[in-house]
Amino acid sequence: MSKVIETNLSYPIGQYQQHPFSIDKKVEWMADIKFLPLQLENAVLNLDESQLHVPYREGGWTIQQVVHHVADSHMNAYIRFKVGLTEDNPTIKPYNEKLWAEFSDVQKLPINISLTLLHALHLRWYETLKYVTDEQWNNRTVFHPEHKKTMRLWYLLGLYAWHGKHHVAHVNSLRERMGWK
């Protein structure tokens, strides 16, 4: 597979791009967080069990793994935000997403478990985000020990808004390539 095609399959909406703080971006990214569960649910709508076990690209996760991964990732994100809002530059806990994707809950449980979790989680997350002040977006930080990097909550908001759209695009691009209506 050519490097360009592989990159497009891995990053169908491109890689995350940082943006300076703006009210317009804040509104956009918060809407992305709010509506991600519905968008992901629509992306997997009417897929059968065999389709859920197709990887979105060669060597990539299956659709089932993607859905459960988004739930795992966004649970971590929600906690990272709350810790970042209540502690001074806390060190966040990394996790091995590749190993998490191999756990039995990901392999065996139906995706509606994670979709339901995402609907509830994103309601709580969005409610929390509505009350983050502009000063907090720019000044509250967390430290990521694997990347050895301090990250503003503003950066994380954009990253996780992108992350959700990124995985919805994985599902939608596979559906399109496979001709699944």
Task: Annotate the PLM regions.
Residues 1-17, 52-98, 126-127, 138-181:
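Short, contiguous alpha-helical
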Residues 2-6, 23-25, 32, 42, ...:
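Small-residue-biased structural context
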Residues 21-57:
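Short, contiguous, helix-prone interaction/anchoring segments in small proteins
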Residues 25, 32, 58, 69-73, ...:
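Alpha-helix N-cap/loop-to-helix boundary motif
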Residues 27, 31-34, 64, 68, ...:
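A generic "alpha-helical surface" signal
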Residues 29, 52, 59, 107, ...:
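Residue-level recognition of alpha-helical structural elements
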Residues 31-43, 101-138:
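Acidic/histidine-rich alpha-helical segments that form the ligand environment
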